[in-house]
Amino acid sequence: MTKQVRIVVLTGAGISAESGIRTFRATDGLWENHPVDEVATPEGFARNPKLVQRFYNERRKQLFSDQIAPNAAHFALAELEKKLGDNLLIVTQNVDNLHERAGSKNLIHMHGELLKVRCVKSGKIYDWQGDIGEHDKCLCCTPTQILRPHIVWFGEMPLEMEKIQTALSECDYFISIGTSGNVYPAAGFVREALFYGAHTVELNLEPSQVRSSFDECHYGKATELVPHYLAQFL
């Protein structure tokens, strides 16, 4: 393969599951035993900000556990970026930092990041590694405003969609890794890439909801599938 091949990779919870990151269980609508509308919607935050902050504080702490680390799939993507540079774009639905820890740099967190918070009024974003408490305020506003997790909740617009759609229109390969295919707009990316002529590939533990839109599908563990498939580009 030449260095000029352009690849967009979409990653979902499946790539981080083997690293020990707990995932949202869509089948029963629970996220770590919390109803989604309580902890992952703007309305839930308005009703009970303490509960929401506590929920994300616990998820943030999880990232610093000795048991959480990038796996072979994350490292394979980072290695491919060394060769392709800006011709590889990773778009992740995950809010963890495992891609960064593996070495990936050309990366879009379309659903936000656990290690960032933002002001509810100005939208100013801050790096944040500890807990968010009720006394933590954004000092950029007068009067001071509360901080919220820099997470895209249900009902909110994903981040950097214009950049993502441009990349989908220009890529030669679209590779989806560890995604369910039931969360939009990400589930529609494969059809966009197909429309513009990309070769589409699904690497998943099991078939996704949009498997029929892929030119090529391979099923198994991400830690095995991803390094093996990406080797052809190295």
From Swiss-Prot:
Q: What class of enzyme is it?
A: transferase
| Domain comment as written in the entry | 2 residues (Tyr-56 and Arg-59) present in a large hydrophobic pocket are probably involved in substrate specificity. They are important for desuccinylation activity, but dispensable for deacetylation activity.
**Organism of this sequence:** Pasteurella multocida (strain Pm70)
Known EC number(s)? 2.3.1.286
Q: Keywords for this entry?
A: Cytoplasm, Metal-binding, NAD, Transferase, Zinc
Q: Which residues belong to any copy of the Deacetylase sirtuin-type domain?
A: 1-234
Residues that bind Zn(2+) = C119, C138
Q: Which residues form the signal peptide?
A: none
List the active site.
H111
Q: From the Swiss-Prot or TrEMBL record, state where the protein is found.
A: Cytoplasm
As for what it does, the entry says: NAD-dependent lysine deacetylase and desuccinylase that specifically removes acetyl and succinyl groups on target proteins. Modulates the activities of several proteins which are inactive in their acylated form.
Protein name per its UniProtKB record: NAD-dependent protein deacylase
Cofactor, how bound (note): Binds 1 zinc ion per subunit.
